[in-house]
Amino acid sequence: MLNRSLLFRNLRLARPRPFLPLVGKRFVTEKSQSQEEKDTSKITENAKEEVKRDTSSLAKESLKLLDLNGLNDESYTGDPGKGPEYTSSTMLKREKQARYAFWGFLGLTGGGLLYYGRRYGPDEKELEKQYPAAGYSPSDWWNRVKARTNNFFSYYQEPAFEKLLPDPLPEPYNRPYTLVLSLDDLLIHSEWTRQHGWRTAKRPGLDYFLGYLSMYYEVVIFTRQYLATAKPIIDKIDPYHVSISAVLTRESSKYEKGKVIKDLSYLNRDLSRVIMIDTNPESWSKQPDNAIAMAPWTGNPKDKELVGLIPLLEFIAIMDIKDVRPVLKSYQGKNIPLEYARREEKLRTKLIEDWNEKKKKGSSFLFGGRSVSEEPPKLIIDIQRERQKAAYAEFKKYIDENGPKMLEEEKAREAEQKTSIFNLLFHPEEVQQQQLEQMQQQQFSPETNASK
């Protein structure tokens, strides 16, 4: 603003003033009047030229004065070909800072490359096996840089733990097979509407599916959701925590090439006895032979696809299949419930035909043959299925009667554990006193004295 005000003040000094000749007579002839007009126009043009020259010289002097005194903080660009472009001190300072930042970035990048390209240390044996590079050639140097860079990012791409599940329990408490189930669009379906907001539906037959198969399998929920959003849903599906053995969330997945993969090799289980049921091909891309592909459930209340898988899963567990992968591979690309029902019916028909053949041949004691049962025989799978259904009915009855009590006891134990940790951190004297009292009660209890 200062330079503009000075400039306009100087320009006002050189403002052209109109010049009119004095006329002595009021009335003149037409000839003298035209001659006077010509003279006046010439004088006016000369005055304008002088004013222009004076104005340009005054403007230049004003700009020089402003530049020399450092009063102009705004960049000014003159006419082309009339001197260099003016750059303010602020812009010069910014350019200097940008140059420092650029060279600093180059220095840090170069230093990082030199550091990452150093020879492997004694604690990098595994990395050296994956990316062997023992020399100092540019290729070896670059291989070490690439190896350490990949190792750095793998911390965020690999699952949170090398063993996602604890070691299996000893016999007879363990389950010989592990069933890995997805959550979204397999067991539940969530949708959002303007009227109701978010709502989550449970798939038909889900309670029976989880409860019945938990007698054969170690049921593991492996979801793409994070733990904070998945846990409330799991608590609704299995409120008494009797069917689901473990829950694995997004933190346990593997991120590779933009895909979220459920790598079963991290489960700490024998893959020959692991079955995954999922709706997303990316999930089983590492172990496709262990997967049963399902179409996403869209909320149909009459759906029976999930319950239709029970006979096949039941057959695998009852027959103690050593490796589930060949069995699952034989069902790929087929409707599993219908295909299994067809195969089982074929076995049942063959068994009945053999029984009829023996019956026709006459297996009476008169001819020295063995007696044939009057009732048609049953498949082993049918006999075991009847037993398991009866056991599940008893289990379901027990859970319905004692489930709320079990849940209250579990919550009380959790609250006691939280209190114990708090007291141990802030009131260790109280914890020691409680332990002494418990020991004294155990020593002087009637049961202890009787045993002695």
Swiss-Prot record:
One Pfam assignment: NIF
Intracellular or extracellular location(s): Mitochondrion inner membrane
Residues exposed to the Mitochondrial intermembrane side: 118-452
Annotated ranges, domain FCP1 homology: 172-316
Main location: mitochondrion
Chain segments carrying region Disordered: 30-55, 433-452
GO biological process: intracellular protein transport; protein import into mitochondrial matrix
Keyword Secreted: no
CDD domains reported in the protein's UniProt record: HAD_FCP1-like
Entry keyword annotation includes Membrane: yes
Low complexity: bias regions: 433-443
Mitochondrial matrix side: 28-99
GO function term, MF aspect, one: ATP hydrolysis activity
Transit sequence range: 1-27
The entry's keywords: Membrane, Mitochondrion, Mitochondrion inner membrane, Protein transport, Transit peptide, Translocation, Transmembrane, Transmembrane helix, Transport
Spans through the membrane: 100-117
Function noted in UniProt: Essential component of the TIM23 complex, a complex that mediates the translocation of transit peptide-containing proteins across the mitochondrial inner membrane. Required to direct preproteins in transit and direct them to the channel protein TIM23, and possibly facilitates transfer of the translocating proteins from the TOM complex to the TIM23 complex.
Family from the record: Belongs to the TIM50 family.
Assembly, per entry: Component of the TIM23 complex, at least composed of tim23, tim17, tim50 and tim21. Interacts with preproteins in transit.
Protein name: Mitochondrial import inner membrane translocase subunit tim50
Gene giving rise to this polypeptide: tim50
